[in-house]
Structures are given as C-alpha cells and as structure tokens.
Amino acid sequence: YLLPMLGCIWSCPTDQMLRFPVATMIRFCHNHGLIRVSDRPQWHTVRGGSRAYVRRMLATIPDARAGTPVRAVRRVPPDSGSAGVWLDTDQGSERFDAVVLAGHTDQSLALLGDQARADERALLGAIRYQRNRAVLHTDASVLPRRRKAWAAWNYVRSPELAQEQSAVCLHYLINRLQPLPWQRPVLVSLNPQAEPAAGTVHGEFAYEHPVFDQAAIAAQARLPQIQGRGRVWYAGAWTRYGFHEDGLRSGLAAADALQAAWAAEDAGAPRAAEAA
C-alpha cells in the first residue's frame, strides 16, 4: 500500500522511494492524512486547474516576459564599483539588482555556468531528477477490467525488475481529479507499460521530478547558506516536498528575504549576503 502510493505522489519508482528519509516521509503523510486507509481528508481542486492561478499571478506582474528564455546569469564583478546581475537572452543583456532562480537546480547551475560557486555546485548538484513521460489519452483499456476497481490513481507494477526500478507506471483518471464536462474517461498515463491506442492520444509531455533522497533533504537544510550570495536567490518546489504549494512558499520566502536585504541597504547596513 505505502510504496505504490508514495511512488504515485512523487512520480518515482518504488525502489527510489525506499531511499526516501523515513522521518520526512512520515511527517508528510501524517500532515496530509495519508497514513490511515479510511476516513481520509476531503481534497479540493482549483476550478480551471493550475493554469487558473498561474494566470491570476501573472496578471499582477507589470512586466512579465513569458517566452523569453534566459541563456545565462552573470554576476557583476564585486571590484567593478557596482553590484547586480546580468541576464542574457536572445534579445540581449539586461542588468538587474538581484535575481531569483526558480527553476530546477540543474537548470540554475547551467545558467550560472563558470560563475557557480563551490557551495552552490555542491548544494544544487545534490538534487537528482527522475525523467517521466506523460501521455494524455482516452483509452480506458489501461485501467482495471472491473470498473468498480477504477481509482483516481491506478498503479501498475511491472513484471520486469529493471523496468520497475527505472520508472513508475500509473494512470491518473482525470475525471476523478477534476470536474471535467465529459463522461468518457480522460487519463494521463505516466510511463505507460502498454501504449494507449494511437487514435486516443491527445498529447505527450516530458517531465523531470525531483528525487528526495537523503542527499536532497540534507541539501535543503543548507539552502540558507547560499541564499543571496552575489545577489542570486533560489526558489522552487525542490526546496521542500516538490509540489506547487512548495514552489509558492519558497518564492514568497525569497521575496521576503529580498525585501529585508533591501531594507537593510536603505538603512545603510552592510549587505551580509555580499560577504562571500
């Protein structure tokens, strides 16, 4: 019961879930009512899905630049007489007072390039990612034969040990998770062992989910040591449990820390984060 459920939550093979720190796992399961099999909490979903609140947040940002990938992040040299960060895009380079890198840790390291410091490389490099393939389709044949056995999450165990250890296979029955206006089953299959019928496939997507092993949990605890160094801050779902709420929480924490740093500058206090 426990390993398949955790594999579904974190989109990781059950073999990797065995390496998940026990204290962190129990704390999460207890907080979310997952340890008990019956009388679980009633979950709510956002009307319109996650894009609804993303759009609401974007509407409050006056100069949001979607579709403008950043190619590199360059810190202004401390001996230049000024401070800040340069962002390089296909449209050119632009200087900012500070930057919050809110992507995956390997993406942040790639953006920093040679300017990544040793402690940043050690911490960000400790977070590993699990590649997953998601297929959106309407082929109900991937679900259990008995319709009464259909669940919101349908875990499939592979008879091949190598496949079972490399990727988790599960089928999300979206009709059970979101109030869709269709009676026909709509599914998202993660790493399907048997391909859905071609005529039922509506999209394929590649994802990378953080793996929360002992090294990752230890890296999370060290995050304050690199925050704000050289005016670079970090945020993302990887800083906690890997969910949307964790990404939001870390973003708010980074914003509060930035505000405190700027308040200290306005008051004439030295910027502690610039010391290293």
Give residue ranges: language-model regions.
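Active-site/ligand-binding neighborhood in enzyme catalytic cores
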Residues: 1-74
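A structural signal for well-ordered alpha-helical segments within the folded catalytic domains
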Residues: 48-55, 106, 249-252
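Short glycine/proline-enriched coil/turn segments at helix->beta-strand junctions
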Residues: 58-64, 90-92, 228-229
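Short, hydrophobic alpha-helical segments
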Residues: 61, 97, 258-262
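Mid-domain catalytic core of redox enzymes
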Residues: 69-210
